[in-house]
């Protein structure tokens, strides 16, 4: 029942976590997520990974790195309450969790934002890091990033510029 979920969640310790999202598919989410997972494991932290949506390939990579089962967070089949419960129940014996998004951050069902990675980040209150593949870009990346950050109310906390040339670091 709803009351059982709320009572359970009240007894769950807050879990440091981050969601790795992308501006689009193919921007490097999986490679960067796996790198982050490996870096955390190398620090001997106990990590719980998640994957947005019904994907099973990326979770296998996560599980191989962390040594524990990756969980799927699918907003199409789960309510916000369900998503919070799933994240909360795995928080008791881990130091940190990393969630990998699916598609573009705001890409949901049909042409809406609903049931997207954005939905998962908002419903679970997970700080989000956006990945942008900026190969071949210069100043154009600035309004793209600004637009993504300002488009909806969201928990975006940072940006990673993937395939960024050394000269663009200064931007």
Positions of predicted regions on the chain:
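Pre-Walker A adenine-sensing motif
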Residues: 2-12
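ATP-dependent carboxylate-amine ligase catalytic core
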Residues: 10-27, 31, 37-124, 132-155, ...
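Conserved beta-strand segments of the P-loop GTPase G domain that flank and frequently precede/overlap
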Residues: 130-133, 160-162
